[in-house]
Amino acid sequence: MNTIDTTDPEATVINVAPAKTALRHWTLAREPDGLAVLVFDKAGTTSNTLSAEALGELNHVLDRLEREKPRALLIRSGKAGGFIAGAEIDELGAIATEAGAVALVKRGWDTFERLAAVGYPTLALIRGYCLGGGLELALACRYRVAVDEPGTRLGLPEVMLGIVPGWGGIKRLPRLAGAPAALDLMLTGRTVDARKAKKLGIVDEAVPMRIMENTARGVLKALLPPRTLPLPLSLTLPPRPKSA
């Protein structure tokens, strides 16, 4: 597999100026070759959860990327301890009506449908816990690279709360892992490590932490079509007529 040397000056991230909508939880950056890097670092907490505000911001990011047309998108966590723990439990507990429950499910479902439908390659770089809505976000990406270390766990534990994966995991996980394995994970709520996730087909690669960045970037950059360079001016001008 091709890898990218992240010490190369050409791989330096170029920060993008904020759009009209300021982002509290996500940071979007662009690299010289057109790769976009989206970092989720939920403000004011030590763990990432997908609150209504965080999902709303993700939609704004997708709006922006629809305009800016990146060549590929890498999604990762800004937290040292994990990728995404899932939905915001406090918001789930505050739902008092059927309409409120439907709105919450629709918000996440529609957002991840948008992510799954983008026209450029997408990859989730997973280190640490990747649970519930976090795994559903990763499943909406085209590729997934997980870090092979004890803290990395993937699963859909919503069943412990009496709910099912409502943000797309219920249809995407069986496509990757097969119906028996997917049902086992969804009905028991158990989690798997990176190696087991790769064996099941949930992730594409399970790699050591030291090469996680190179592997993720290498997967995406190997998919990018070569850039077309303009021809030298001498080759684009019509030939001069021969002098008499």
Where on the chain are the PLM-derived regions?
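Conserved CoA-thioester-binding segment of acyl-CoA-metabolizing enzymes
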Residues: N2-R76, E113
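Glycine- (often His-adjacent) and acidic-residue-rich active-site loop
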Residues: E68, S77-T111, C130, M160-G162
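Hydrophobic/aromatic residues within transmembrane alpha-helices
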Residues: I75, E88, L137-A138, A197
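Glycine-rich beta-to-alpha active-site loop
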Residues: W109, R114-L161, P165
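Active-site-adjacent scaffolding segments
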Residues: A117, V145-G151, M160-G162, G166-R175, ...
